[in-house]
């Protein structure tokens, strides 16, 4: 009997306790349009407010919200949505009834008024770091520091662009590019052309992914740079027009007008932009603009440029358009298009070179003068179609992307090279005795196409676990047709030995899957993933009648472990394996000749480069970011310049060199990186980055075993100051010490940018003046191999000044479609958790 009484007592107690909890639910709607407001902030507070926020959730795409398992007590419900009046409602304890939930029904939020009267101000973080990427957001101050999107890329932490415009990411070559998350199957030279033709106002930001997850292509041993083009974030119609003028000296100057137009309503988000640029470049005739020493055995040769002169003109157009349409509350259709034209109708290059030998370096015994003219044009087009479908209230979704891109380029050049012997013993008369002349007329046409289709599936299993999977197929083709004619008795005739056609095809099919889970009250996060890729390639060299086929399969594991000591104190470890596939031209065995002393060729036996990457990183208060990275690359691809030997079946000068790519063995790289990003005061922002990089290279070359190491140091400082009366100042400084690439070494370089600007008429009109300056007096490089030592010096460019004017027009009001939370944040907030 006592046992029965005890059981009944416990049962009644449990029932009584369970009756103290219930769910609170409702819907959030726009009172004027009678439409659901998705992702509204819904907050429960204790009425006394002594403990602050009790629960927080976000409304779903139907405007519905629910707080689960809420204790019986006096509460206050607050609902906030940008552009709408804040809603408050008391929920007294007496509203709680046994066994019943509290249904608040439909809650109508009042719109604040005319869109023109709504002003939303929020300071955007310039540097953001999350799970996989570093994001550098581009605001007006940064965009006005430079004249094009290429120079804007120089400001990104971790990106190194040297004086020769070669790019590295976190100390490594092999960088893959995306635009708005879409892969760009273009070589770096083509991407440079595209960025130089784009106005900086078109760029919303650059995302740096040094450890991309498995949903990304495995291409890029250094990582991925995602170019984020601007999308409209304001309701209604708005836009901007502007023009920028730049001048380096009397030979280098140009201008760039641009315009943007945007439109947003409850269904559409549309944005489009156009820019035009025209640029004149040149260098006056000046002595010693470049000097090259060559040691081969005991022979030392000096090539000295005595009066190099350059002149060129180029112009380009750039268009971009994006649109997304909400089919319903669960699905969205998107379209994007980018088109660009870059033309150089005239280019002139006069390159007289004196040749002398040890010990009489300044008494030339021979010389040559290369006079060339060039006309070129290129255009590129990229199209993208996307569809996203939300599958359930947990934000499970499936997405599909279809992408197409193409690039065409044509270059026509005329070259006349005269070779001289020493005659009178002084540099004024050395060009009087021609012993041989060569003339070439060349046309180089290159066409590339790429099409890809992918499907991605995202499934939150619960609050702690999510699953991702997908597949992608990609087809790429390129055709390079090189036609050469040689001058003979005053007439240009076909030169079959120097003409070339190379066709290349590549197909990559991939599958991936990833699982993320969180433990210990969501403090510990674990992500594991695998990506499988099958690659099929075919290269056809028409002149040699050779065909090269390669088929290989790779799997790419990926691991991420992170632990949050506090919300703003996180430690993470990443591992990834990535690949760098040879570009089509690097596989072409055709030998290209630029002069008697310089040749280049490809390597059909080139293998893909693989890289294991480990990273340990820490973020503190979203201000201080520290990382230690180690990578080991096998079959690393590098271009080597070595003496041209007798294995090539044509006559050549004993001073000739040839450049070609090889798999050099392996390399190890260790990098310590520390970044600081903080608003020191309300109007002063500082971003600083610095560290040290160690690299070690081992390679087996035909005539030498290479074992070299190098320590490099780097730093950058980026600061912005808002002054009274809407003046603003900004400055950027970058330094990198000497760098090594296998058998080559280059000196350090420095870069400085400064900007002053002012806004008028409620920030609608902006004026900006900036200066960009390479602080190196000369750039130097050195190549050592076997018994050859090659040293080069080149003059640095003078500072470039840029002045820009921008006028904004239309309505600027944050649209609710842009206020959607990221999936990860939404999953964490939805449902409010349990007590």
Go through each PLM region and give its residues:
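Short, acidic, small-residue-rich periplasmic hinge/interaction motif at the N-terminus
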Residues: 29, 41-45, 78-82, 99-142, ...
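Short, acidic Ser/Thr/Gly-rich low-complexity loop/linker segments typical of extracellular
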Residues: 48-64
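N-terminal periplasmic accessory domains that precede
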Residues: 101, 105-107, 149-152, 191-194, ...
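Short acidic/polar hinge/loop motifs at secondary-structure boundaries
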Residues: 149, 155, 182-210
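Extracytoplasmic beta-strand/coil segments of soluble accessory domains associated
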Residues: 150-187
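Surface-exposed extracellular loop regions of Gram-negative outer-membrane beta-barrel proteins
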Residues: 228-245, 284, 288-289, 305, ...
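Outer-membrane beta-barrel signature, preferentially recognizing the C-terminal barrel domain
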Residues: 500-505, 579-634, 657-670, 792, ...
């Amino acid at each position: 009997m006592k046992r029965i009484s005890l059981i009944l007592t416990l049962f009644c107690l449990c029932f009584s306790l369970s009756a103290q909890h219930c769910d609170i639910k409702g819907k959030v709607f726009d009172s004027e349009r009678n439409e659901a407001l998705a992702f509204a902030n819904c907050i429960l507070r204790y009425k006394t407010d002594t403990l602050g926020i009790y629960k927080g959730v976000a409304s779903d795409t139907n405007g519905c919200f629910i707080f689960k398992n809420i204790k019986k007590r006096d509460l206050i419900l607050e609902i906030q949505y940008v552009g709408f009046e804040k809603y408050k409602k008391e929920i007294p304890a007496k509203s709680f009834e046994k066994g019943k939930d509290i249904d608040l029904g439909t809650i109508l939020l009042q719109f604040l008024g005319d869109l023109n009267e709504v002003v939303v101000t929020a300071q955007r973080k310039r540097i953001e770091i999350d799970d996989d990427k570093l994001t550098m957001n581009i605001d007006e101050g940064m965009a006005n520091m430079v004249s094009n999107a290429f120079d804007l890329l120089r400001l990104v932490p971790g990106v190194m662009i040297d004086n020769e415009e070669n790019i590295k990411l976190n100390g490594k070559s092999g960088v893959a590019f995306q635009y708005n998350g879409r892969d760009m199957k273009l070589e770096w030279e083509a991407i440079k052309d595209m960025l130089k033709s784009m106005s900086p106002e078109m760029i919303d930001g650059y995302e740096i992914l040094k450890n991309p997850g498995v949903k990304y292509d495995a291409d890029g041993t250094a990582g991925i740079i995602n170019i984020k083009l601007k999308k409209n974030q304001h309701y209604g119609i708005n836009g901007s027009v502007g023009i920028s003028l730049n001048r380096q000296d009397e030979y280098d100057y140009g201008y760039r007008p641009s315009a943007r137009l945007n439109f947003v309503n409850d269904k559409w988000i549309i944005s489009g932009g156009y820019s035009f640029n025209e640029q004149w470049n040149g260098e006056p005739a000046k002595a010693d603009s470049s000097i090259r020493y060559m040691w081969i055995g005991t022979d030392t040769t000096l090539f000295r440029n005595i009066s190099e002169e350059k002149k060129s003109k180029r112009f380009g157009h750039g268009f971009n358009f994006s649109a997304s349409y909400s089919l319903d509350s669960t699905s969205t259709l998107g379209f994007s298009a980018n088109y660009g034209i870059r033309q150089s109708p005239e280019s002139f290059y006069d390159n007289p070179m004196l040749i002398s030998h040890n010990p009489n370096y300044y008494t030339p015994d021979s010389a040559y003068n290369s006079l060339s003219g060039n006309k070129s044009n290129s255009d590129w087009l990229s199209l993208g179609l996307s569809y996203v479908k939300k599958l359930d209230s947990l934000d499970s979704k499936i997405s599909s992307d279809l992408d197409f891109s193409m690039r065409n380029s044509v270059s026509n050049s005329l070259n006349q090279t005269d070779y001289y012997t020493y005659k009178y013993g002084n540099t004024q008369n050395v060009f009087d005795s021609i012993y041989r002349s060569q003339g070439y007329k060349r046309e180089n046409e290159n066409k590339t196409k790429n099409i890809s289709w992918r499907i991605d599936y995202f499934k939150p299993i619960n609050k702690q676990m999510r699953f991702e999977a997908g597949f992608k197929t990609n087809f790429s083709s390129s055709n390079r047709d090189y036609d050469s004619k040689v001058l003979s008795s005053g007439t240009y005739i076909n030169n079959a030995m120097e003409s070339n056609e190379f066709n290349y095809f590549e197909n990559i099919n991939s599958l991936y899957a990833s699982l993320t889970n969180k433990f210990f009250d969501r403090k510990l996060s674990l992500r594991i993933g695998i990506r499988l890729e099958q690659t099929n390639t075919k290269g056809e060299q028409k002149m040699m009648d050779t065909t090269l086929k390669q088929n290989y399969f790779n799997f790419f594991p990926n691991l991420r472990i992170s632990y949050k000591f506090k919300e703003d104190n996180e430690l993470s470890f990443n591992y990834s394996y990535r690949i760098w596939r040879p570009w089509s031209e690097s596989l072409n065995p055709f030998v290209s000749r630029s002069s008697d002393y310089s040749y280049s060729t490809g390597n059909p036996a080139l293998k893909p480069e693989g890289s294991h990457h480990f990273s340990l990183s820490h973020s503190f208060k979203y201000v201080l970011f520290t990382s230690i990275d180690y990578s080991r690359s096998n079959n690393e691809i590098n271009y080597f310049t070595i003496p041209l030997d007798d294995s090539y079946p044509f006559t050549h000068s004993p001073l000739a060199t040839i450049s070609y790519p090889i798999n050099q063995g392996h390399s190890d790289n260790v990098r310590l990186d520390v970044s600081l990003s903080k608003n020191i005061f309300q109007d002063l922002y500082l971003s600083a980055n610095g560290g040290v990089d160690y690299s070690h290279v081992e390679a087996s070359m035909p005539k030498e075993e290479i074992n070299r190491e190098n320590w490099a140091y780097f730093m950058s400082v980026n600061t912005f100051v808002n002054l009274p009366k809407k003046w603003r100042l900004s400055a950027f400084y970058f330094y990198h010490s000497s760098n090594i690439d296998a058998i080559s070494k280059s000196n350090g370089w420095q870069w400085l940018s400064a900007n002053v600007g002012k806004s008028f008429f409620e920030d609608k009109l902006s004026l900006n003046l900036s200066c960009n300056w390479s602080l190196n007096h000369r750039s130097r490089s050195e190549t050592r191999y076997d018994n050859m030592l090659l040293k080069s010096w080149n003059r640095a460019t003078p500072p470039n000044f840029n002045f820009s004017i921008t006028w904004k027009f239309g309505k600027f009001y944050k649209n609710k479609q842009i206020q959607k939370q990221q999936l990860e944040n939404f999953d964490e907030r939805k449902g409010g958790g349990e007590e």
